[in-house]
């Protein structure tokens, strides 16, 4: 698919996307295959995860079975070291803001109420509570730490974007 240029009301092209980023939850297919083959797995395929409730069930079950899966946690560590919280302050925060703006029928607002704060907190807590490290250690973790955990197969999932492959592929021992 192509991305259409941005046009004004007069139909004239005003901008052309130069780069498009996508982000979400990346998952390790090998770990998920192992999980889905386990007796009692909450899903038989990662494609079945289409809502928060299912993601929560799977994440918590993976965390409970981390030894059997050979991982340290369902999610790679949440990087909260100084200057490293951009995944949570911008990327993750964009989601509730998007839905609030959609509810307002607007592209921008000077007065956001953060009406989807509960959903934001639920996802953030899911990351913290089902992590490779105790949540008290999150303030000492960097994005590099988190991506190394994911790259080395110590975590089944990590929140990041399409730019992450460069970082994953450079980690010694990546799987």
List where the protein language model places each region:
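Extracytoplasmic "Venus flytrap"/periplasmic binding protein-like
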Residues: 1, 5, 12, 30, ...
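Extracytoplasmic/periplasmic solute-binding protein
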Residues: 7-19, 23, 53-109, 155
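Short, polar/flexible loop-turn hinges at active-site or ligand-entry regions and domain interfaces
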Residues: 37-49
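Glycine-centered hinge/linker elements that transmit conformational signals in sensory
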Residues: 56-63, 99, 103-141, 169
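Beta->alpha turn/N-cap motifs
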Residues: 143, 160-165
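C-terminal lobe and pocket-closing loops
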Residues: 163-174
């Amino acid at each position: 698919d192509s991305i259409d240029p941005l046009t004004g009301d007069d139909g004239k092209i005003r901008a052309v996307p130069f780069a498009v980023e996508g982000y979400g939850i990346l998952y390790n297919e090998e770990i998920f295959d192992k999980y889905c083959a386990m007796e009692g797995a909450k899903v038989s395929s990662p494609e079945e995860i289409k809502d928060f409730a299912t993601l929560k069930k799977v994440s918590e079950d993976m965390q409970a079975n981390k030894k059997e899966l050979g991982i340290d946690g369902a999610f790679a560590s949440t990087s909260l070291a100084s200057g490293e919280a951009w995944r949570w302050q911008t990327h993750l925060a964009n989601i509730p803001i998007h839905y609030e703006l959609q509810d307002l029928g607007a592209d921008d607002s000077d007065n956001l109420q953060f009406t989807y704060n509960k959903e934001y907190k639920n996802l953030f807590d899911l990351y913290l509570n089902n992590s490779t490290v105790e949540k008290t250690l999150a303030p000492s973790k960097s994005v590099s730490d988190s991506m190394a955990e994911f790259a080395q197969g110590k975590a089944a999932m990590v929140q990041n974007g399409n730019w992450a492959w460069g970082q994953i592929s450079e980690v010694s021992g990546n799987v």
